[in-house]
Curated annotation (Swiss-Prot):
InterPro entries: UPF0358, UPF0358_sf
Entry protein name: UPF0358 protein BPUM_1375
Gene3D superfamilies per record: SO2669-like
SUPFAM superfamilies: EF2458-like (SSF140404)
Parts forming coiled coils: none
Family indicated by similarity: Belongs to the UPF0358 family.
Length: 93
């Protein structure tokens, strides 16, 4: 039973981290849709703050043993790739 609870907590932790990553993507997409320049200081500040916050959440979950370090890095890498793709798409408009 204890191992089932641990697995459940791990699944919940990863699901919450993925939800936070999705929120960042949506926020950035909205900003990019409404800004004329992706190098806007506000855009960069929001991106930096949100990415830093998510990285700290992931680090905390890893330290608690709820998320594998590789899985956390994979989540951040995926988000960074998607944000880069959004930026590239915006600059090619």
């Amino acid at each position: 039973m204890a191992s089932e609870i641990l697995v459940d907590h791990r699944q919940k932790a990863l699901a919450l981290l993925k939800l936070d990553a999705d929120k960042i993507l949506k926020l950035i997409q909205v900003q990019m849709d409404n800004l004329t320049m992706p190098q806007c200081p506000l855009y960069e500040e929001v991106l930096d703050t949100q990415m830093f916050g998510l990285s700290r959440e992931i680090d905390f979950a890893v330290r608690l043993g709820l998320v594998d370090q590789h899985e956390g890095k994979k989540l951040l890498d995926k988000l960074e790739r998607e944000l880069s793709a959004l930026h590239d798409a915006f600059t090619k408009k």
